[in-house]
Swiss-Prot record:
This protein's encoding gene: cbiD
Official protein name in the record: Cobalt-precorrin-5B C(1)-methyltransferase
GO MF terms, alphabetically ordered: cobalt-precorrin-5B C1-methyltransferase activity
Keywords: Cobalamin biosynthesis, Methyltransferase, S-adenosyl-L-methionine, Transferase
Keyword DNA damage: no
Enzyme class: transferase
SUPFAM superfamilies named in the record: CbiD-like (SSF111342)
Family: Belongs to the CbiD family.
Reactions accelerated catalytically: Co-precorrin-5B + S-adenosyl-L-methionine = Co-precorrin-6A + S-adenosyl-L-homocysteine
Length: 378
């Protein structure tokens, strides 16, 4: 186990969570120890590296092998208490000394290949991100000195199977995992890393020339787009609860048309100016629904009944019974107004639309006819 992180924890809601280290740190440590083993011609069972964040990791080495001027070694990925798809897998490096001072880094079995533009790596390259490329080269150069070189191959036998649990397929990374990590350290409960992974898909689609995008909270939204709107799911990007962040990213990337599509219970919060829709941040669903119904002249008895509802689905039954379904269109319109207010100082504002649906995947309302929105997206 890594000694430096043994007592390094973060606190969240009164609980402590142990930090871990990234696939990039694993690859760096594996490459470093394999190089050391070649030079010393002996097996090494522990290796230390300094991560980009300045944290020193002392890591156990698994499956060390030496064969003349080449060696390989593995480091087991430990995500701490942030257990992701790569937690517990072995990341290997094979190092072969060269006759010149060049250091090359490539991906082998289980490391994905980049098949689309937009993630900061050339198409056809291994999915080894910029920071790990730098740390791997620096660690090996430190061991070899300036006069020697090596060919380094990073591989992960479980990578192809593990990658099926990640966003790699959507990002155009095929055949394996990504070797990533800007700090080298995994911080549990980190919203920033989650948000960044979502924004990466936006960046990729913009790099492909796309100017129109659909943002959805999750899988239900994508299903609605596919089944009810008959649109290509390539238009869809998941925003999770980070509505404001993803809208700002879409504005930064100069998308021309952004459509929010989601269940009433999630997107109604945006109509109230709540741009982080997780329940631990804010609720306001019933209050917002009641406000818009009151503006339509709904009777006090309906408002009182809806205020007592625990879910928007329950409220929808009461709304339908009394014929106030128009409220969904007014809420969708208000969502777009809130977004325009948030981005009012933008030098390049995008066109915004909003569509609300129910749990049974049926459209409820929109800021303008859904057929017009679909036509604009084609």
């Amino acid at each position: 186990m890594n000694i430096a992180l043994a007592d390094d924890k973060v606190w969240h809601k009164g609980k402590s969570y142990r930090k871990g280290y990234t696939t990039g740190s694993c690859a760096t440590a594996a490459a470093k120890v394999a190089t050391l083993m070649i030079l010393r011609q002996q097996v090494i069972h522990q290796v230390s590296i300094v991560t980009p964040s300045g944290v020193t990791l002392q890591l156990n080495v698994e499956e060390p092998l030496i064969h003349g001027l080449q060696a390989s070694a593995a480091i087991r990925k430990d995500g701490g208490d942030d257990v992701d798809a790569t937690h517990g897998m072995l990341i290997y490096a094979q190092v072969v000394l060269r006759n010149d001072a060049t250091i090359t880094i490539s991906g082998g079995t289980g490391v994905g290949k980049v098949t689309r533009k937009g993630i900061g790596l050339p198409v056809g390259n291994a999915a080894i991100n910029k920071t790990p490329l730098q740390t791997i080269e620096a660690a090996v150069r430190e061991v070899l000195g300036p006069e020697r070189g090596a060919d380094i191959t990073i591989f992960a036998p479980e990578g192809e199977e593990r990658a099926q649990r990640t966003y790699n397929g959507r990002l155009g990374i095929e055949g394996g995992i990504s070797i990533i990590g800007t700090t080298g350290i995994v911080t549990p409960m980190s919203e920033e890393s989650w948000k960044r992974s979502l924004a990466l898909e936006l960046e990729q689609k913009r790099a492909q020339g796309m100017e129109k995008i659909i943002l959805v909270p999750g899988n239900h939204g994508e299903r609605f787009v596919r089944e009810q709107m008959q649109l290509d799911s390539e238009l869809v990007v998941t925003m999770s609860n980070f509505v404001g962040y993803m809208l700002q990213e879409a504005e930064r990337l100069a998308f021309r048309h952004v459509v929010l599509i989601g269940h009433l219970g999630k997107l109604i919060k945006v109509a109230a100016g709540i741009f982080h829709t997780h329940s631990h941040i804010a609720d306001g669903r019933m209050e917002t629904l009641i406000t818009h119904l009151a503006l339509l002249g709904a009777p006090n008895s309906l408002l009182q009944a809806i205020y007592a509802c625990n879910t928007t689905e329950a409220a929808m039954e009461l709304i339908e019974a009394q014929g106030y379904q128009e409220v969904y269109n007014t809420i969708a319109t208000r969502i777009c107004e809130r977004i325009n207010q948030m981005l009012r100082y933008s030098p390049q504002p995008f066109q915004c639309d909003a569509i609300l649906f129910s749990l049974d995947n049926q459209p409820l309302g929109s800021n303008r006819p859904i057929t017009d929105i679909v036509e604009a997206l084609r």
